[in-house]
């Protein structure tokens, strides 16, 4: 624009009454757009002449208003013969005027003038006709009633946007989120204004004094550091939320007063978590606070639900799941029940291995037929899960595991079915079976072969060893030795009998989960120090286990008081610290970006180990010995659909293989660097990491991998276990992506919640992604199994992998999927989700 040297200093009154400096560039740009919109070319000289005429005529106008400027532009264009451009400019003005009118009408009806700016941003960001605010106004007015308060009208406006969400107009869920966020922020600002608090430090001081925030945050950070952290906040990232995600976060994740009033914003929540996770960093602590905050607030990484909920709070139990080995003794069983109760009290889920507990009819102190079997004890576990309900929020959650050769297996497989003796049922636990390779081999080659069920206590008594302590060929040799020993009582059935019970229960109840014990232990990077008997509640954890053992009970006298001291050997009580990469929100093709993101997530998870509040000392000791973590993924189907990759395609298989190899490489690289900085885990020597067997078993033979293996051998590893893919049912909603590694259930559906219907939309649903979102029950499950097998090579632990079947599936077809998974090296199978079956989701492992 050539007339800048002749700038006229004036003020213009905006429509809201505010006076601001007049910017003639805006007139120039508006006219230029009008000419461009009509496909008309205009020389710079003529444009300057038009602008000069407009400015000259405006210079005598007092006061100068927006409408007066636009009137003068129209008049000048017509005087110079540009009628079509002037007409287009007039129509454009009318359209803008209509947009303003609908905004003002909605804001006035709600009674909130500040809403106008939110609506203006919505109009700018959602320009398609299907997202017209006129439709929102019409729906909103149908909800309005006489006597409604301003808050009720704001809630009705949000509800209107929610109900406009359809498969054809999915972005209304983002508009609804903005409206919800505006209402929340207005109320939140009023809450803090009423308390006389105006900055982040003041908020943290108040929350700490009220016992809602852990005092350790302000003890570790100075006032200046908190002020620096406040500058990291990016409120605009709230616009990444869908309505479902923001609604869930405000109801369950942000800190609330004791009267259930939310007291922190979503961004303050992410920052609070980051402050906690970086608390003990020695160097560049504020830099790590920012990196942790950025990965969380950009929704590129989600921490597990306990970490998201409890970080920054006084009781900061950050771990998701725990796994206990139940001993075969009265004291041991009740200790395990007590452990479960304490874990459940603080929101953790539990896996319990019952494979060492003697079967029904076994001996007790030599008395024949005295043992009641595992079912009676599992019923106590069931009642504990119901009784310890986390302050009335939700009941405890536990998976109980039993070996496929245990004599109580037939009754165990009917724990949750609807027929049979109710005294032998436990409907609130999740049964899971530990299968040896021999079982699947017989199911594939000779399903009518005999299968012998035995009591582990009887084997230990007769043979002097515990059969469950072995795996692979050594287990097979000892199993056959027991089968051929007439001193050991057998309950002989066929493989087909067990398969039939397993599949019937799976189709009817979704369980038992499957744990392929030989595959797990063969690929265990820490097999030099122990064995893995079972997995956790959600079947993604595979870590060394050992039962807690009673050593002695002694009586002492101290200061005249009698003290009873019980000594125990802590065993290996498994702990899961989880987080997930949101693959749908990440540039997975960008190797450098992925490596940096994985490095940040690994460091955050490692910090959880030292910062955690442990409900049990056994858990703390095991976690600090192995320093195990579980980095997983969510948004798997989201990632594929965004890239135009069909689930049922070879391209899917090749892509997932490449992505998970990249994730694993980045994780190992980050972890060994962390070991160099902070020290290796205690049992590194002799592990597959140290010997190189970890890399050999997975076929990592490229130059890049060989170089990394050498580095690991020298530097060590910070964490004994690295990767585990959890279900992420809740946190995937927060981050607006698909759950875990599952395909979506439907492109669009309505979920009934507290009397209203909430729309659920596939992530980033559009005409570009529509045909790549195939519903889970319509997918050929063999593609899912093959993909799981490829991923499993790169995952040192396991995956929460579901099978989706319809009523058309035969038992033989379901068995074929189990066999295919076993052959592919898949370590675990979570639910078998029949289309007609509702199954419960694990919130503890949601990451």
Q: What kind of region is each of these model predictions?
A:
Residues 2-8, 18, 44-271, 287-293:
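Core nucleic-acid recognition elements
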Residues 88-95, 102, 172-204, 435, ...:
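Terminal amphipathic helices with adjacent charged low-complexity linkers/tails
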Residues 255, 261, 270-285, 289, ...:
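Function-dense linear segments that define catalytic or interfacial modules
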């Amino acid at each position: 624009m050539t007339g800048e040297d002749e700038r006229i200093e004036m003020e213009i009154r905006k429509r809201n009454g505010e006076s601001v400096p007049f910017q003639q560039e805006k007139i120039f740009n508006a006219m230029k757009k009008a000419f461009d919109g009509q496909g008309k070319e205009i020389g710079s000289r003529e444009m300057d002449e038009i602008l000069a005429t407009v400015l000259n005529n405006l210079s005598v106008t007092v006061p100068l208003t927006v409408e007066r400027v636009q009137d003068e532009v129209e008049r000048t264009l017509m005087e110079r013969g540009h009628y079509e451009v002037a007409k287009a400019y007039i129509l454009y003005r009318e359209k803008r005027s209509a947009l303003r009118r609908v905004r003002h009408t909605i804001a006035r009806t709600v009674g909130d003038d500040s809403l106008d700016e939110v609506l203006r941003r919505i109009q700018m960001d959602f320009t398609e006709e299907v997202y017209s605010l006129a439709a929102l106004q019409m729906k909103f007015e149908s909800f309005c009633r006489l006597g409604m308060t301003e808050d009720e009208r704001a809630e009705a406006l949000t509800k209107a946007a929610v109900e406009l969400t359809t498969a054809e107009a999915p972005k209304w869920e983002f508009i609804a989120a903005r409206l919800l966020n505006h209402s929340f922020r207005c109320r939140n600002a009023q809450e803090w204004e009423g308390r006389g608090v105006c900055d982040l430090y003041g908020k943290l001081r108040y929350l700490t004094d009220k016992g809602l925030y852990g005092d350790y945050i302000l003890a570790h950070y100075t006032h200046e550091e908190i002020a620096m952290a406040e500058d990291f906040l990016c409120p605009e990232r709230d616009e990444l939320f869908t309505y479902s995600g923001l609604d869930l976060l405000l109801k369950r994740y942000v800190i609330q007063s004791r009267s259930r009033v939310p007291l922190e914003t979503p961004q303050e929540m992410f920052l609070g978590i980051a402050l906690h996770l970086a608390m003990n960093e020695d160097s560049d602590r504020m830099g790590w606070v920012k990196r942790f905050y950025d990965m969380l607030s950009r929704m590129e990484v989600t921490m597990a639900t306990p970490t998201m909920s409890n970080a920054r709070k006084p009781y900061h139990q950050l771990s998701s799941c725990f796994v206990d080995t139940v001993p075969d003794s009265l004291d041991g069983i009740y200790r395990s029940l007590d452990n479960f109760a304490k874990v459940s009290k603080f929101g953790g889920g539990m896996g319990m291995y019952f494979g060492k507990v003697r079967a029904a009819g076994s001996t007790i102190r030599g008395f024949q037929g005295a043992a009641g079997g595992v079912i009676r004890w599992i019923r106590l576990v069931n009642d504990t899960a119901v009784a310890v309900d986390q302050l009335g929020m939700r009941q405890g959650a536990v998976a109980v595991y039993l070996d496929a050769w245990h004599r109580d297996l037939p009754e165990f497989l009917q724990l949750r079915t609807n027929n049979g003796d109710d005294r032998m049922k436990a409907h609130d636990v999740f049964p899971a079976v530990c299968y040896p390779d021999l079982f699947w081999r017989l199911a594939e080659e000779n399903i009518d072969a005999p299968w012998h069920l035995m009591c582990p206590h009887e084997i230990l008594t007769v043979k002097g060893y515990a059969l469950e302590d072995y795996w692979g060929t050594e287990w097979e040799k000892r199993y056959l030795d027991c089968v051929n020993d007439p001193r050991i009582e057998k309950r002989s059935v066929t493989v087909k009998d067990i398969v039939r019970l397993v599949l019937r229960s799976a189709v009817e109840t979704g369980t038992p989960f499957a744990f392929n014990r030989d595959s797990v232990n063969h690929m265990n990077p820490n097999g030099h120090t122990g064995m893995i008997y079972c997995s956790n509640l959600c079947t993604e954890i595979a870590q060394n286990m050992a039962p807690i053992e009673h050593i002695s009970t002694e009586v002492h006298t101290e200061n005249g008081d009698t003290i009873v001291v019980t000594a125990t050997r802590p065993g290996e009580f498994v702990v899961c610290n989880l987080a997930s990469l949101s693959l749908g929100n990440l540039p997975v093709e960008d190797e450098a970006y992925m490596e940096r993101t994985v490095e940040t997530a690994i460091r955050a998870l490692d910090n959880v180990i030292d910062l955690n509040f442990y409900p049990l000392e056994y858990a703390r000791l095991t976690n600090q010995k192995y320093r195990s973590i579980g980095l997983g993924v969510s948004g798997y189907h989201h990632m594929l659909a965004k890239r135009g990759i069909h689930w049922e395609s070879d391209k899917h298989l090749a892509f997932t293989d490449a992505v998970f190899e990249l994730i694993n490489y980045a994780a190992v690289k980050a972890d060994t660097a962390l070991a160099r900085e902070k020290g290796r885990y205690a049992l590194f020597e002799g592990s597959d990491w140290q010997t190189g067997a970890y890399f050999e078993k997975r076929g990592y033979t490229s130059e890049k991998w060989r170089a990394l293996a050498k580095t690991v051998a020298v530097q060590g590893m910070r964490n004994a276990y690295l990767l585990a893919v959890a279900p992420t049912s809740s946190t995937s909603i927060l981050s607006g992506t698909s759950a875990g590694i599952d395909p979506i259930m439907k492109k669009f559906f309505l979920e009934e919640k507290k009397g209203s219907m909430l729309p659920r939309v596939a992530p980033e649903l559009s005409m570009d992604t529509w045909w790549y979102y195939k519903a889970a029950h319509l997918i050929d499950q063999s593609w899912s199994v093959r993909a799981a097998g490829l991923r499993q090579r790169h995952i040192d632990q396991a995956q929460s992998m579901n099978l989706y079947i319809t009523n058309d599936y035969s038992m033989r077809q379901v068995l074929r999927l189990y066999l295919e998974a076993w052959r592919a090296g898949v370590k675990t199978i979570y639910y078998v989700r029949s289309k007609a079956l509702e199954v419960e989701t694990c919130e503890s492992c949601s990451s």
